[in-house]
Amino acid sequence: MAGIRRDRQAPQRLILDSGAVIALARGDQRARAFLARALELGAPVEIPVVVLAETVRGGPRDAPVNRVLKAVGSPPETREAHGRTAGRLLGLARSSETVDALVVAHAVEGGGAQVLTGDREDLDRLAAPHPEVWIHPL
């Protein structure tokens, strides 16, 4: 399992998956504390565009998610390499969780990151070959 790796220095970048964005939108204290600590340390915080697609629907119910997005900033660019890495991760993990694979690929392609998630099991499997990606469950 990928999980929290204590034998290496933690990556100084935080990526939020859909579960983390929803938890923040709902005011989850653990998610808020994790985000606050990252911001306090000056760590870049990113929400991949695929997470945006999974968490908004274009109506007034998006307001809490939009507040999280505004606090974090615009999603970073997704490149072809992200798609190719996600495909490899899906194959290695024998998974069909494309959104999760793209989140992990975003971490891999950026040289590593901590990923805050509501779906640890799937992300652990996908991140297993990449010690530079740390998965933190909510």
Where are these regions (language model features)?
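Histidine- and aromatic-rich ligand-binding microenvironments
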Residues: 16-17, 47-48, 96-97, 130-138
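Alpha-helix capping/helix-boundary segments
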Residues: 20-21, 51, 82, 102-103, ...
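Phosphate- and divalent-cation-binding pockets in alpha/beta enzyme and binding domains
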Residues: 54, 64, 85, 125-126
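Acidic, PIN/NYN-like endoribonuclease modules and their adjacent C-terminal/linker elements
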Residues: 1-9, 110-138
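Short beta-strand scaffold positions
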Residues: 47, 77, 98, 117-118
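Short, well-structured N-terminal submotif of metal-dependent ribonuclease cores
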Residues: 1-47, 56-73
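Acidic catalytic patch
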Residues: 72-93
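Acidic, metal-associated active-site segment
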Residues: 55, 97-114
